[in-house]
């Protein structure tokens, strides 16, 4: 039996947050998918999610996550207003699936990201 960094009840929160982050970064902020993946995996947030830090797994929205990742990695404030989006884009589902895969496999986002390039 594999021991995960956080309990299964938080997986849906992490999936929704990362799905929303991918969707917002790519479709609203117009950050390329490759660039966002690179920023995410080098940010402290990828490791904090991997470790199950409650503030990251259940305490942030995807939009907040993108703003903090961009500030941490690029030292730049995003001045883009968030939009209410009730549809689920392809980018959303990519982030959603990656969050689950990371939790299930216990691989780091950096390791998963290396397979991407």
Where are the language model's segments positioned?
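Conserved small/polar residues in nucleotide/adenosyl-binding loops
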Residues: 115-117
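Thiolate-centered catalytic microenvironments shared by cysteine-dependent enzyme domains
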Residues: 110-113
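C-terminal alpha-helical interaction appendages
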Residues: 1-104
């Amino acid at each position: 039996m594999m021991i995960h960094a956080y309990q299964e009840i938080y997986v849906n929160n992490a999936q929704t947050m990362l799905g929303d982050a991918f969707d917002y970064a790519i479709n609203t902020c117009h950050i390329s998918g490759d660039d966002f993946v690179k920023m995410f995996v080098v940010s402290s947030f990828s490791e904090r999610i991997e470790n199950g830090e409650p503030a990251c797994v259940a305490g942030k929205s995807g939009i907040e996550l993108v703003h903090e990742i961009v500030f941490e990695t690029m030292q730049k404030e995003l001045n883009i207003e968030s939009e209410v989006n009730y549809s689920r884009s392809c980018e959303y589902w990519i982030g959603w699936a990656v969050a689950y895969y990371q939790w299930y496999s216990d691989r780091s986002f950096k390791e998963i990201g290396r397979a991407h390039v």
